[in-house]
Structures are given as structure tokens and as C-alpha cells.
């Protein structure tokens, strides 16, 4: 027996409102599209769903009620102008990271950088976006998660930029240092959530990989370790790093304690919060 699409969407919308009131209708559309293996626009070309399709939707709704992020359920996430495959164990890209992309694009255009390192590649959203944007760059991307590297490789192949991105397993810059990889620009959206923030995180966020979120007791552990390594490197390179507004001033103080002479620029997100810093060693 078939069930009217409109009725199913309204039912899903009402249920999802209890979890995510701001985007309930959008989530309902995306879940239906996922079950049909079509895009959102397609669902409005049909009038009915089968009982089997509705049963699948009920199971997906149960997962949402348990706090499983929508993007893990439908296995995709739109970021910038690309669609990425995502799965459990890999950080879901956020819109805030698009600020980092804009800063990186502007920097690459102005400085003509060709050799770029990304620390913590995740789903590949940053490296792939930049690789699609610039024809003549080479990106060396690393992560401490084998799952993330697997997903990033898949997404790079999907977007036909595998030849521009080389993936490494490892922490910070060590995989590149051990291979004598030369680079001009470092990009990273590192873990920066402090211990005190964890109790206040949304249930969905807590389902994402802890290693991709936790930045130590004060959220600054990654930055300290990176700056310790960079202090040994010398000059003539740039780093573009995403930060939490809560640790902005702490990171600046850490930088000033580590380095006597660096140029620091900061960039705000769409809500006016400090979200990205650019550090130039010259």
C-alpha cells in the first residue's frame, strides 16, 4: 500500500522538530531522498512512497532520536561547493571552516604557493576544495585516523583530484618531515575543544570522533605541539589555522611566547567570532 509523500514529510518533520527544530523539514527531505537514492529535487516528482520505504524512514528516524548525526545517516555532507562522503569515525565538515578556505584561497593567489600541507585531513573537505580550485598545487595531507584517510582518499577520487593530493598517516608534520617534503603553507582545522566544553556539547557532536574534537584541558594542545615543531624549522612559510573563539587570546599568547617575530592576522566567521588565524614566519 502506498502512502502520500506529503503526509510522510509532514510526519517526519513533526518528529524531527523534537531533535532539530530549525532544520526539521530539510532533514525530512534529505532522509526521503536518501531512502529513494535520489536528490532532494526528485522527491517532489513523485506522489507516493511504498510501505517498505516508509519502514526504512522509521528506522532512520530512530537513529536520529538516538543522537546519530544526520550526515552519518545519509552518508554525505555539502561543503563549500562540493558534496562529500562521510561516515562514523570521521569529523563532519562545518560551515565555519569555509572561512579557512577563503583565507587559504586568497593567500595562495597572492603568494603563489604551490606546496601545501594539511594537518588533520578528515573527510578531505579542505584539501579537495583547494585542489579543485587551483590547477598547479600539490597538497600533502595527513591524519592520525586511518578511517579519515580512507574517506579522504575516496572523496579525492570522486572529485578527480587524487593526483594533486598525497595522503600520509601520522601526527602533525612528522610524516612530511621524515620524507623531507618541502612546503610553503600549512593549513589545519585541528581539535580545539577544551575539557570544560564537553559537557555542554550537543548530543550529535558527541557522536563524532573524540580525537578530532578534543584539544586538551584548555583546547590549545595542538597549537603548542605545532609551534614547538615549527620553532625548529626556521622562516619563510605561512600557517592558516582554525580556532575556537574561546581560545583565540590564549593561542595568540602562546604564539608570542614561542616566537619573537611573526605576523599574525585574524579572521571572523559569519557570526562575528574570531575563527581563523594566519601566521607568517618571515
Curated annotation (Swiss-Prot):
Keywords: Methyltransferase, S-adenosyl-L-methionine, Transferase
Root EC class: transferase
UniProt cross-references to CDD domains, sorted A to Z: AdoMet_MTases
Catalysis performed (reactions): L-glutaminyl-[peptide chain release factor] + S-adenosyl-L-methionine = N(5)-methyl-L-glutaminyl-[peptide chain release factor] + S-adenosyl-L-homocysteine + H(+)
Function, in words: Methylates the class 1 translation termination release factors RF1/PrfA and RF2/PrfB on the glutamine residue of the universally conserved GGQ motif.
Record: residues binding substrate: 189-192
Transmembrane segments: none
EC number(s) from the headed UniProt entry: 2.1.1.297
HAMAP family listed in its UniProt record: RF_methyltr_PrmC
Family matches, as NCBIfam families: hemK_fam (TIGR00536), RF_mod_PrmC (TIGR03534)
Chain segments annotated as coiled-coil in the UniProt record: none
Positions with a binding annotation for S-adenosyl-L-methionine: 120-124, 143, 189
Gene Ontology MF terms: nucleic acid binding; protein-(glutamine-N5) methyltransferase activity; protein-glutamine N-methyltransferase activity
Protein name (Swiss-Prot/TrEMBL): Release factor glutamine methyltransferase
Amino acid at each position: 500500500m502506498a502512502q502520500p509523500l506529503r503526509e510522510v514529510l509532514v510526519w517526519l518533520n513533526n518528529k524531527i522538530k523534537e531533535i532539530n527544530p530549525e532544520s526539521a523539514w530539510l532533514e525530512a527531505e534529505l532522509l526521503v531522498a536518501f531512502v529513494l537514492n535520489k536528490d532532494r529535487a526528485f522527491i517532489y516528482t513523485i506522489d507516493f512512497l511504498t510501505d517498505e520505504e516508509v519502514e526504512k524512514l522509521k528506522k532512520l528516524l530512530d537513529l536520529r532520536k538516538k543522537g546519530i548525526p544526520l550526515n552519518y545517516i545519509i552518508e554525505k555532507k555539502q561543503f563549500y561547493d562540493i558534496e562529500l562522503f562521510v561516515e562514523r569515525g570521521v569529523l563532519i565538515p562545518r560551515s565555519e571552516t569555509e572561512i579557512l578556505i577563503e583565507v587559504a584561497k586568497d593567500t595562495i593567489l597572492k603568494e603563489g604557493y604551490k606546496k601545501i600541507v594539511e594537518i588533520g585531513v578528515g573527510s578531505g573537505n579542505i584539501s579537495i576544495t583547494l585542489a579543485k580550485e587551483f590547477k598547479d598545487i600539490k597538497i600533502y595531507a595527513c591524519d592520525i585516523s586511518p578511517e579519515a584517510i580512507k574517506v579522504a582518499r575516496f572523496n579525492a577520487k570522486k572529485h578527480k583530484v587524487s593526483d594533486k593530493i598525497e595522503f600520509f598517516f601520522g601526527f602533525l608534520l612528522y610524516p612530511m618531515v621524515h620524507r623531507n617534503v618541502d612546503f610553503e603553507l600549512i593549513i589545519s582545522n585541528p581539535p580545539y575543544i577544551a575539557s570544560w566544553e564537553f559537557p555542554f556539547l550537543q548530543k550529535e557532536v558527541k557522536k563524532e570522533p573524540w580525537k578530532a574534537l578534543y584539544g586538551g584541558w584548555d583546547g590549545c594542545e595542538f597549537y603548542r605541539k605545532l609551534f614547538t615543531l615549527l620553532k625548529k624549522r626556521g622562516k619563510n612559510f605561512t600557517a592558516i589555522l582554525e580556532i575556537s573563539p574561546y581560545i583565540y587570546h590564549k593561542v595568540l599568547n602562546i604564539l608570542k611566547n614561542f616566537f619573537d617575530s611573526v605576523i599574525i592576522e585574524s579572521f571572523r566567521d559569519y557570526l562575528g567570532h574570531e575563527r581563523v588565524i594566519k601566521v607568517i614566519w618571515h
